Amino acid sequence: MESITNVPAANVGRVVQDFIDDGATNVAVEQNPDVTFNVTRN
């Protein structure tokens, strides 16, 4: 499992796409209280 934490909202789509392009089959996005996001791949 690999996570990138505190991703600004404007970059979430790019990070998710990068993970998918790299072969990830499961990508989870969770919002943090400070309006950044954590993106995790399995």
Regions found by a protein language model. Name each.
Residues 6-42:
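Short, charge-rich amphipathic interface segments used for partner binding and complex assembly
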Residues 1-5:
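Short glycine-/aliphatic-rich beta-strand segments at the starts of folded cytosolic domains
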